[in-house]
Amino acid sequence: VHLIKSLLVVTAVALSGCTTAPTLPPPTFPGIEQSNKIAIEDLRPASESEKKIFSLMVSSDAYAIYRVADNATDPTGPRLLAHRAYEAFPQLAEQPSIKVLHFVTYANMQSHLRRSVTQGLLIGPVGMALVGSPSYPSSEVLTSAINSEQLERTAGDQEHTRAYFTEQENPSKSPVNVIYIDAEILGKRVASRCLVPPVTGKPNLFLVEAFDMCIANHLALHRSINPATAPQ
């Protein structure tokens, strides 16, 4: 258990800032100060901004699932959401505020670490656990609209299930990040789930870059979704 715990802790540190072990400096966002005027009403459960390893037991359904802390990136997810919304919606100049009901990120390394433990291939925690290992095929970010009630139903003891994925979404069972965004912008509330596998063309992907991809998709959903036909 001590070895597994050490593996997860080092992995957690590695994943806190990046998804695929970049060697380059993290990206910057020129002009982000222009959106400082956008007030962020943070209505998230306090726990969503905190780091957590859900289980160290290999037999647990929550094994190797990790919640990423807000301070893992600069800017934070909600701050980057406000900036991209400011760029996307000129109307925010007249209504300079957004409500963030959920913005939370999970790392799911369950299949990867179970395989490693079972086969006894613990050849170094960072090498074995980083998302984006060369042994996994690259894919694309997958974003879908969800009913925000899904997040309420999975709070508490079921929170780890938010990091699950289907075989169709991730047939190779690669380590992934799963990012949930639930925000009200210009009076319209939209919730989304974004699955980030090792990304094609991005061998060195920072977590904040994954945020940016998911936010772009979320804002596209915001434009296209009619509240009357939103997911139930």
Describe the residue ranges of each PLM region.
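Short secondary-structure boundary motifs at beta->alpha junctions and helix caps
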Residues: M57-T73, A163-P231
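Sec-dependent bacterial lipoprotein signal peptides
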Residues: V1-T20
